[in-house]
């Protein structure tokens, strides 16, 4: 089963995302900030990463850029899932290396559909 890394500082958001993804057979791991997300991605080589932006320490933009520039992780698809919904935020996220951008609130069904579409591509 594919492994999905969730990088988000909200335990509630992480719980909802993990529950939805695991219900559909995905394995999940979670990180509470960008630095931990980068470390786990390098160690675990997940099949997909859902990345929040606003987190303490290393934010999601910085973590995405770090992963996109690291040989072992540059091919892992990263989808930003965040409350920052301005067009400039979306463009900046994509320019850092994300392949897609979802604005919260995101329903569990939409999250699972996005994972399925990304991993089957």
Which role does the model predict for each range below?
Residues 15-23:
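Charged docking surfaces used in two-component/phosphorelay signaling
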Residues 25-32, 40:
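Short hydrophobic/Thr-rich beta-strand motif most characteristic of the beta2 strand and flanking loop
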Residues 44-50:
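Active-site beta3 strand of CheY-like receiver
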Residues 99:
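Short, glycine/charged-rich "phosphate-handling" switch motifs in NTP-dependent
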Residues 55:
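Receiver (REC) domain active-site loop signature in two-component systems and cognate sites
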Residues 106-116:
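C-terminal output helix
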